[in-house]
UniProtKB/Swiss-Prot annotation:
Pro-peptide positions on chain: 19-46
Protein name: Hainantoxin-XVIII-7
Role noted for this protein: Putative ion channel inhibitor.
Species of origin: Cyriopagopus hainanus
Tissue note: Expressed by the venom gland.
Taxonomic lineage of the native organism: Eukaryota, Metazoa, Ecdysozoa, Arthropoda, Chelicerata
Length: 109
């Protein structure tokens, strides 16, 4: 009986020490006290760009196998709608299949 009382008392002391009150001053960089504002931006849900147009997301590009891909022009990264992945017909066919799967999981309306 005394052992169970000691265990309960110890548990209560640990709980009081572990959970500080809300009145205590928050420490700078304390993640539990920081608040974050989340801004939801409207994103494109339907296609509006053709192959070769600049894009930001797959949803902007029209076509089942067209994705927003990255190319490098003069050392700078440029995103544009594209469907060709290779000069080899077999690899290009596989690439279009992968583009189709990528568009399937983009959840564009």
């Amino acid at each position: 009986m005394k052992l169970s009382i000691i265990i309960i008392a110890t548990s209560l002391v640990i709980a009081v020490v572990a959970f500080p009150s809300k009145d205590s001053k928050a420490i700078e960089n304390d993640k539990t006290e920081q608040r974050m504002e989340i801004v939801v931006q409207e994103t494109a849900r339907a296609c509006s760009k053709q192959i070769g147009d600049k894009c930001k997301r797959n949803c902007e590009c029209c076509g089942k196998t067209v994705v927003c891909g990255t190319i490098y022009v003069g050392g700078k990264e440029v995103n544009q709608c594209m469907d060709k992945t290779s000069d080899n017909a077999i690899l290009n066919g596989l690439g279009k299949g992968m583009n189709f799967m990528e568009n399937t999981f983009s959840f564009c309306v």
